[in-house]
Design a protein with these regions (language model features):
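C-terminal accessory helical subdomains adjacent to catalytic cores in phosphodiester-
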Residues: 1-7, 18-38, 49-62, 69-166
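Short, charge-patterned binding micro-sites
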Residues: 44-48
């Protein structure tokens, strides 16, 4: 019996979020226990309004914008508020779009860490996620930039997949 297909729309800030959603789609669709097949339609687009303008909408559509705040610095706080304003503007295009907030803490790395470990305690800067990330996955990345190279990130996702198979 063929499964019904559900589509979910995302705009994401960067490559790691896109790679993660592609990986998640594959894991869901390969599961025999899944009631549906899914399409996680994600585009790297920091501006929610640009994502909405680029879509042909035939029916009411929800889009989730996944982004992080980076830090408590005023520049990042302003960027965060500007993104919220652009989400509101996207909903006013007359395209029947509902934009949802997919906020991911200071950094998307928290999502990845939580696949393997608890991450208790306050973190005030994104660089503080490097040590828990290395510990959780037995890695030795010297920077978050090194971790974000596609081959390294895909290795982390493969590790997540192997763990879920146990």
């Amino acid at each position: 019996m063929r499964k019904e297909k559900l589509t979910y729309y995302f705009s994401v800030e960067g490559e790691t979020e896109k790679w993660y959603l592609d990986w998640l789609q594959d894991r869901i669709n390969e599961s025999r226990d899944a009631k549906y097949t899914v399409k996680l339609d994600s585009k790297i687009q920091k501006d929610p309004l640009a994502r909405a303008k680029g879509m042909t909408i035939l029916q009411k559509t929800e889009i989730t914008h996944v982004f992080d705040r980076e830090s408590g610095d005023s520049v990042h706080a302003r960027q965060f508020m500007a993104t919220l304003d652009r989400m509101k503007a996207a909903q006013s295009l007359g395209k029947n779009i509902k934009y949802r907030l997919g906020y991911s803490n200071f950094t998307f790395e928290l999502w990845i860490i939580l696949h393997k470990a608890n991450c208790n305690g306050a973190k005030t800067h994104r660089r503080q996620y490097l040590a828990p990330l290395n510990t959780a996955y037995g890695e030795h990345f010297e920077s978050l930039e090194e971790y974000k190279h596609e081959a390294n990130f895909q290795r982390i996702l493969l590790h997540c997949h192997r763990e879920s198979q146990r």
